[in-house]
Amino acid sequence: MNFTPIFAGTKTCYMPNSVSLHRVLKASPEKVYRAFTDKSAIASWLPPWGFLCTVHEMDVKVGGGYRMSFQNFSTGSSHSFGGKYVELKPNELLRYTDKFEDPNLPGEMMTTVELRKVMVGTEIKIVQENIPDVIPAEMCYLGWQESLEKLMKLVEPNIPDA
């Protein structure tokens, strides 16, 4: 079982099979929320470095579902996953399930994304829980760090139309 530190104020808690991330982005909550709910946007930033993403289905509403695949650009191998949107508050909160199609990666994860407007942009907090035992939580954490770096590069520039 993996234990990942969860930071609550100045206290560090350890939760099995979970990761917790926190960032501040120089972009509005509306723009960050759109990056999570637009097919083309999420395909550009969610996969970690070296992976491509295909979004097969994305119905962003409570009870709606999504399905996507990540393909390793080096080897060509891919894995597919999907889930359901459990809770949505535009520009504030997304909570959704994640389930791999591979039977060797059992269980259902829960991902919670909280957005809060701050003076310089948006504070984003992400918690992913119930990561399958066969996936090191550190690997998920590293993947999320890479994804959030790509998200930042998508949402922070303010490029006017020509």
PLM feature segments, named:
Residues 32, 42, 66, 85, ...:
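Hydrophobic pocket/interface hotspot
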Residues 16-22, 29, 53, 65, ...:
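Intrinsic-disorder/low-complexity, polar/charged segments enriched in Ser/Thr/Lys/Arg/Asp/Glu/Gln
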Residues 20-21, 40-78, 161-162:
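Short beta-edge strand/loop motif at the mouth of beta-sheet-based domains
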Residues 2-52:
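Hydrophobic ligand-binding cavity/cleft-lining segments
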